Amino acid sequence: MDTRGYSETKKGRYPVGKKSLESPNGYSNYGTSMDNELSSEYASRGMHIGDLENLVNEIEDEWKDLGREDYQPISTALELLDDSSFGRDYKSFLNVYDRISAALQTIAHTHKDDFTRGISAYGEIMEGIQKCNSRIIALKQSLEASQECIGNTNSKELQQTLARSSQYKKVISVLKELNEANQLFDNFHTLVDSKQYYHASDLIRRVWDELSRSDFDGILVVEQFKSRMTGLLSHLEDILSEELVSITFLKDAVAYPIVSYCSPNPLRETSNPYFLRDFLKNNANTSTLGQSEQLRYLEEALSLKLSDCLKMDYGRDSLRDIRIVLESLNLLGKLPNAISSLKSRTSAEMFTTVDSTSRAIVNKYSLGNNVSTVNPFSKSLYDIGLHAETDREHTMISEFLTNLFTKLRCVLMHYRGISEFMTKLETKTPKHASSSHKSSIMSVNSDPTSPKVSKFDTSDSTFPFDTLLQAFESEIRLMLKDYLISKEEYIENSGNFVVGTEMSIYNLPGENEEDKLFDVTNEIAVENKSNAFYARINELVNEKAPELILNKSNASVSTIELFSGSSKEIVRLAGHVVFVGPSVFHASSVLPQTVFFLEDSVSILKNPNIPPQFAVNFMKEFLRGSYIPQLYKFMSSHFDTIMKDVGAFQLHRDWKIYSKIPIFKCHVAIVQYFHDLQDYLPIVALNLVEFYELLHTLLVRFRNHCSDYLSDLCRTAVLKEYKHVNEDTEDVDDTVRVKLLHDDVTYPQFIKFLKQKNPSLEGLNELCRMENKRLLQYEDRAITSEVKLPVSVLSKDSDLVNSVSYLHNSMEWFLQRCFSRFMNGSRRMNVLQQNQANFGGDFLPIDNLLGNNSDLMKGAYKEVFDSLQRLQFDALLLIRMEVRLQYIHSINQSVNLPDYVVEYRGRPDASIMALNSTIVTTNLKLETCLNEWERRFVFQGLSELVDSSLYSIFYKIESMNRGSCLQMLKNMSAMIQILKTVKEIHGDVEFPKSSRVFGIYQNGAKKIIEHFIAAPKKELLPDVKQMVRIYYQRLMKDAKRNGRDDLYRQYQKKIGSVLTQFDNTVGGARKNP
C-alpha cells in the first residue's frame, strides 16, 4: 500500500486552501474561485466533496497515525503482523486500502483535468512568490538607498516634499468632495420646485458640513464653492421666509382645512342676545362649539411628529406646512431671521389681508357705479336725516367681516402653531448660527446627537405676539372706525365718494394738491402755490414713473393706522377701500362678529405672555373712547335737529294716530327717535348700559327744552299782552310765575295730590284753601316787600292756554309711552291710542340689561321721570295760576283803593266784562285741549278765591258810596254767572262773604246800626265795624276837605261810640243768650 501517497495527499490539501493560494500580486480570491470550480465539477459528475470528506474522517478516526507529520509506515506494518490483542486487523486495513484505492482511481479519473489545472496554478503561485521576493529585495535596496540619501539631504527639503505630498492628497480629496457636492445644484431646484423644502435644507446642510471640515480650510476653490452655496442658502432662506408668511396669512388661494374650523357659526349671535354684555363682563367662561373644534384641530396638528408631517403631501394642511418650514429653517440655522422677518411684516401683511378682503367685496358688488338703495326704514328716521343700515349694506358688511375674521382666526391659529412648534423642534440648529439677516451658516454636524449642535432657544428671539396684537388691534380699530365712526354722519350711496379721475403721489385722498405735495408723514412737506410747479411734477411722474399714477377707486377711502418711530405712535396714512359710508347703525352688523372674533382670539392665543383681558380691554377702550362719544354726538345731533325744528312745539298733524288728546310734534318725534334707535341698534340697546346713560342725558336735555319753552311762552305772552311795560320791570320777568309756583308751600302738596291714582275731593278743597290764602298773602305783600303777584297774561285772543295745555298733554302722553313702569297707576286716563299701547311692558328695557344691578340706573331714570312729570304738572298748575291771576288783576282794576266811589252804571265794569270774556274763551279752549278732569281742576276753588279776594278788598276800602256798592254787586253777579258755566269739580258757585258785606252795606249806616243792635251776631261784628268805618271815614274826608275840623272830630267820636256800642251789644247778648 502506498501510504505515503495517501499521506501526502492528506497533507497536500492545503494547496487548494484560501491562504496558500494568495498570490504575490494580491489576488486573494484565487483559491476561493478554484474551490467553487471543483465543487461545480463534482456536482456535475455525481460525486460531491462531502463524500471524500467522510472517507477521510473515517480514516482519521480508525487510522490516526496515517495523517501525522512524522508517520512511520513500518509501525503500521508491525501492528498488522501482530496477531495478539494489541495488533490491528489486517483485513480491515486491506478493506480501507481497497476503498481508498477505488476512491483515488475515481477521483483521478473524474478530476484528471482538475489536478492538471491545480498543478498549473501551483506553478503560477510559485512564480508569483519568486516575483514578490524579487520586489521585496528591490524595496529593501531602495530603502537602504533612501537612508543613505536622507543622510545627505537637509530637513527643509524634506518638509517641502512632505508639504507637496499633503497638498496632493488634499487636492485629490477636494476633487472627490467637489464632484459629489456639485450634484447639489442639480438636485436642489428639483426639490424646491416640488416644495420638498425639508429635504432641500437637509441636502444643503449635509454638503455644507462636508465642505466645512478643517481639511478644506484655505482652499480657494472650496471657498468659491461655499460662496456659491451661500447664495443658494440665501435663496432658500428667502423662499422659506416668504413661504412662512404666505402660509401664515393665507396669501395663496389654498383650501386649507383650517379655514372651515375658523369660519363663524351663523347661529352664534341668536343663541345669546346679550353676548356683548357677557363679553364685557367677562362672563363668557365656557367655550363655544366652534372654539372647541378649533382647539381640538390645533392640538391634533401640534401632536404630530416631524416624520408624520413629511409623509403627508405638502400644501394639504397649513399647520403641517408651517411645521416643515420651521424645521427647515431651524436646520439651516435661519429660524431667528425668519421670525424677525415675520415680526417686521406682521403689520403690513395684516393691512394687506384687510385691504384685499375689502377690495374683493368692492369688486364683487361692482361699487364703482352709483347704486340706489331701497329705504326699508320708518319715515321718521329719514324725516330727520338719519342714514340707517340698508339690507344691501348689511349683506356686504356681514360678508366682508365673515371673510376677514375667518382669515384673522387662521392667522392667530398659525401664530399659535408657530409658537408651539418653536418649543418642540426636532431638528438641530448650529450653536453659533448668526441671527442676522442673510448671515453665513457655521460649521455644523448633521447628526442630531452631535455635541456641536443644540435645540433652538426661543428665549433668544422673542416671539412676536406683541406685534401681532398691535397689528390686528390696529386693523380692527381702524375697521370699526371706518364703518362706525365719522366726523359727520352723511347720506350717500356706496361709491359716490369721487373727487377726480386720477390719483397721483401728490394727490392723496383728502389732500388738496394746492396745499401740499406728497405729505404722508406730516413731517416734510413741499409747499408751493405755483400751478406750473405741479404741472412739471406731473409731467416728470408721467414720463419717468407712469406706474405711480393710479386710477382712483370710486369707493370711499379710509385711513390706516401704522406704527412709526421708536415711540410707536399712531399716524394716519391713506389706506383701505371702504365700500359703505360710516354709520352708527352698522353696529348691528359689525359688533357681533367683532366680539366673537375677540372671544375666539382669547381662546386661540392662550399664552402666559398675553394678558387674558386684552380683548375685553380693547373693546371697552373702543366703545368708551370712540363709539359711545360718536353715538352721543350722533344722538345729540339728531336730537337737536328735532328740537330746533321751527314746528317742534306745534301740534302734530297726525296726532290722533298716536294720542287721544292733542300733542306736540317734537314729543312724537322724540319717542319715535328713541324707539328707532333701539330697533336699529338692538345690539347696543340690549348690551350697553352707556346707551341708556346717553338716553338719560337726552331726556334731561329734553326736559330742559320743554321747560325753556314754557318759560319763553310766558315771557312772549307777557311782552305781547303788555307792550307798554318796560322789559326791565318785574312785570315782564318770565321766571316770576314759575318761581311763584315752585317756592310756594302748596306746590309739593299739589304735586303729591296730582300723582295720586284716586285723589280725594276733600284733599283738593283743603289745598285750594291753602292756595287762596297764599295768593292773598302775596297780594297783600305779607311775605316780603320784594315779592308780588305777576300780571296775568291771559286774554281772549291769547294762545297761551292752548300751548301750555298741549305741553301738558304731550308730557302726559310721553310719560305713558316711555315710563309706564313709574306711573304706578296715577294716570286718570290712558291717552295712548291702541297702536301706541305698551302691551309688552316698559319702553326702556333696562331690567334685562342691568339685571340685579339696575337700582342705580332705575334711580336716575326715576329722577328724570319725576322732573318730566313735574313739568307736566307745572303746565297744568300754570294755567290754574294764570286764571287766578287774571281774576285778581281784573278785580283790582275794577276797584279804586282806598276810596271806592263810582256811579252805578247798571252793567258790569269793563274789566269784569273782559275777565268774563277771557274766562269763557279759556274754558272753551280747555275743553278742546284737556281732559275733563284736568279742565275742572283748573277752575276748582276759583269761586272761593274770588270771594276771599273781594272780601279782602272790602277791608281795604276806606270810603265807598252806595253806587260803588251796587256796582260791585253787579260785577259779582256777572262773575258768578260765568263761573257756573265752567263747572268746577264740585260745589255751588257763590260768594258768601263778599255778597254779605256788600249787600248789607248798600242799606246805609243807619239801618246797619239799627239792624245789628236789634239782632247782634258775633260773626258779623268785624264786618259791621268795617261798614261803619267806611261810611264815617267818607264823611270825615269830606269834612276835612271842606275845612270843618269840628265836624271831623265829631265823626271820629261817632265811630268810637258806635263801635263801643257794638261791642257792648255783642257782650250783652253773650251774657243773656
From Swiss-Prot:
Subcellular location, record wording? Cytoplasm; Cell tip; Cytoplasm, Cytoskeleton; Cytoplasmic vesicle
**Which InterPro entries does this one have?**
Sec8/EXOC4, Sec8_exocyst_N, Sec8_M
- Compositional bias of type Basic and acidic residues: which residue ranges? 1-11
The answer to whether UniProt assigns keyword Cytoplasm to this entry is yes
Q: What does this protein do?
A: Component of the exocyst complex involved in the delivery of secretory vesicles to the plasma membrane. Also required for polarized cell growth and division septum assembly. The exocyst complex plays an important role in the targeting of rho3, as well as the two main hydrolases required for cell separation, eng1 and agn1, to the cell wall surrounding the septum before cell separation begins.
Q: Which PANTHER family match?
A: EXOCYST COMPLEX COMPONENT 4 (PTHR14146:SF0)
Q: Which protein are we looking at?
A: Exocyst complex component sec8
The scientific name of the source species is: Schizosaccharomyces pombe (strain 972 / ATCC 24843) (Fission yeast)
Q: Which gene encodes it?
A: sec8
